[in-house]
Amino acid sequence: MSIITDIYAREVLDSRGNPTIEVEVYTESGAFGRGMVPSGASTGEYEAVELRDGDKARYLGKGVTKAVDNVNNIIAEAIIGYDVRDQMAIDKAMIDLDGTPNKGKLGANAILGVSIAVARAAADYLEVPLYHYLGGFNTKVLPTPMMNIINGGSHADNSIDFQEFMIMPVGAPTFKEALRMGAEVFHALASILKGRGLATSVGDEGGFAPNLGSNEEGFEVIIEAIEKAGYVPGKDVVLAMDAASSEFYDKEKGVYVLADSGEGEKTTEEMIAFYEELVSKYPIISIEDGLDENDWDGFKKLTEVLGDKVQLVGDDLFVTNTTKLAEGIEKGIANSILIKVNQIGTLTETFEAIEMAKEAGYTAVVSHRSGETEDSTISDIAVATNAGQIKTGSLSRTDRIAKYNQLLRIEDQLGDVAEYKGLKSFYNLKNK
């Protein structure tokens, strides 16, 4: 009864109006699962391949009919007949079927859509929530959210180089209260920006995209918003950032070009000094992709300087890849990994990366992409793995709110068992 009888994929749209893939899996018993695949704007050089059609006459070349056909004609033939509960075997079969190191033949988007849909169908078959199916009955930790309330870089058309300025409500007793605190700071920020005559339009991830005078002004205005909302910066709410430095690194010159803000060129050493200065002035607890994805020597220096007191997250640096992560762990680079399911392409490999990080004392931050859908699987993954942190955008746009609302449901379902760890989520820091 748990045997897969049908797999079907179709082309749908993501939050940016670009095509993405949706996959449905059916079993003999009538159990059903659906998975939708996100897409990034700033992508790491070593990410698994997102297969696009390249036909400029259709969706400007961004169609995914090739990926859809690969699911319907190749993957389906190989996977139909499997027990839907055998996630690892199904994921491995798809990896072997693709046969490339980066899933470039079938497309990571095709493979991931099936992987998610299979997990959801298995949970439906067993009549348990997805987070319980994926994590067993020790799933209890609600993640501390990184809420991206100011967007810059590749996520907005403004004068800010850094891609994300985030708040983390570490002083909240529950996820529900953390979400409320974040929403109140978000609305306070809207009021402040409006009062200054600045735009309150939002970027890809639902954060505001104002034309501020400098990158540092992003932190200043958020501190003001935290206080306006009635909270204490550094105690109730701390700051996090995603520099996405690979996006403004000039490979030919070997320097970081802060062109949007007009702050000029900086060497690796100057960037590290800049981060040191920011951390000394503002309650910044997490910096993601502070340096270019290939600047491993620089990352090692950054880790030596700030690694005891600041979470240094590798996104483009590690691309949710256990081989890259293992190398980083061995070399003492960063102390955290960003987990994006579509960077690697299967749930099995995603869980392996999270487990490897935890074993090494690195944190794992489960993350959305800038091009999202209403699929809320990452919320279940965050709880299933007790990861402790999630990054899923701002307090606007339904594609972001869908993840927060799912976490509210999960916390409600868990009842007294649910834990919200706040500052304790940063077990990788010696000096919090």
UniProtKB/Swiss-Prot annotation:
Q: What class of enzyme is it?
A: lyase
On whether Iron is a keyword of this UniProt record, the answer is no
Pathway listed for it?
Answer: Carbohydrate degradation; glycolysis; pyruvate from D-glyceraldehyde 3-phosphate: step 4/5
What binding details are noted for the cofactor?
Binds a second Mg(2+) ion via substrate during catalysis.
Could you say which residues bind (2R)-2-phosphoglycerate here?
A: Q163, K340, R369, S370, K391
Question: What keywords are assigned to this protein?
Answer: Cytoplasm, Glycolysis, Lyase, Magnesium, Metal-binding, Secreted
Question: What family does this belong to?
Answer: Belongs to the enolase family.
**Which PANTHER family does its entry note?**
ENOLASE (PTHR11902:SF1)
Family annotation (NCBIfam families): eno
Q: What is this protein called?
A: Enolase
Q: Which organism is it from?
A: Enterococcus faecalis (strain TX4000 / JH2-2)
* The gene coding this protein: eno
